[in-house]
Amino acid sequence: MKKTSTFQNGLIWFGAGVSLAEILTGTSFAPLGMAKGFAAILLGHISGCAMMLLAGLIGGRTGRSAMETVKMSFGQKGGLLFAFLNVLQLVGWTAIMIYDGALAVGGIFAIGRWVWCLVIGALIIVWIAVGVTDLGWINKITMAALFILTLVLCKVIFFSGNAMVGIDGESLTFGAAVELAVAMPLSWLPLISDYTRDAEKPTQATWVSVLVYGAVSCWMYVIGMGAAIFTGEYDIAVIMVKAGLGIAALIILVFSTVTTTFLDAWSAGISAESLSAKLNGKKTAIAVTVIGTAAAILFPMDDITGFLYLIGSVFAPMIAVQIADHFILHRDRFAVAADARNLVIWLVGFIAYRLLMGVDTPVGYTLPDMVLTVVLCLLAEKVKPTKQM
């Protein structure tokens, strides 16, 4: 497989950041107001992107896919658990993204949500068929169009003389808002090494990927929050129609959905290869897209906050164990069947995260949970040092 340039990796993660799911999640921050909402978005993204960076660096240094790096901490069979959970979350994301895209486009051209689900699903399959290293000029044109259209969206929301409107709806605490901001980069954490491992300069590509994604993701959250605060409107498609964007709105909604969801489906295929050597990554990615399209047609997926918190509870303690092993303890358990100690520590971290959800902390739940998990790893190593293999 030919190597990807740092610029190509930046484009890939720009596409991941320009996402309807991120804009829609941003609308949830409106009750906090612009200042507190922006602070929560920034704090959450700094925390989440730091973890994403470390995960990408592990993959870049070792040349292994995301789920193969997990086996370095949890062993061959232990790593299969997380590969399976990752495939599940990616099938979920594929369905959610197709659902959101079809719902938004349906607000502009009302010909039935299921039709748009099929159109978006078909385009994702085309993206998969072309492949991540051969997208080249297609990605460049798409990203340029998305960039221009998001600037137009910013102008409509922030520079049209709109006054702030009263926000109704459920109250969101600052800590819960931080956690919603952490959740997006955290959801990409089990994927980033699938791309940095194929980079010409893995370390440079990882830094660029995370910085680009972090900046664009914050931007999308702010667009969503601003839309709710300044226009009182939570439906981005409606805002675009009111602004007279029409076909331009259709383009940005469809292609932002395709470029983001492609990454979910593609990485689901790569993770599936970790489950069984018999599985072909590209074919599995296409199968995931078909399943996601069917789910988007059949099931409502309007509120994804519970899904985001579930992702956090699974993958925050997982990456905490990896960080402790790779960067502090320098343990490599890739050759063992399963590392029972790390699996128990992960389970404690998972339970701790779920319990922390009942406590309102100013830094959310992920950071305290990760600190606890890393400390447990260090204590366990001190009590019973790992035998060199």
Language model segments and positions:
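Membrane-interface "cap" regions at the ends of multi-pass membrane proteins
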Residues: M1-K36, G48, D134, T173-V178, ...
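C-terminal membrane-solvent junction of multi-pass transporters and transport-like membrane proteins
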Residues: K3, G169, A320-M389
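Transmembrane alpha-helical segments of multi-pass small-molecule transport proteins
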Residues: I12-G17, F82-V87, I108-G131, A144-C154, ...
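Extracellular loop-to-transmembrane helix junctions
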Residues: T27-L57, G78, Y213-A215, P368, ...
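Membrane-water interface regions at transmembrane-helix termini and the short interhelical loops
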Residues: T27-P31, L57, I96, D100-I108, ...
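Juxtamembrane transmembrane-helix boundary signature
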Residues: L42-F74, L81-V87, E381-T386
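Hydrophobic transmembrane alpha-helices that form the core helical bundles
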Residues: G78-R113, V258-S274
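Membrane-interface loop-to-helix entry segments
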Residues: V115-I157, D168-G169, T206-Y213, L308-A320, ...
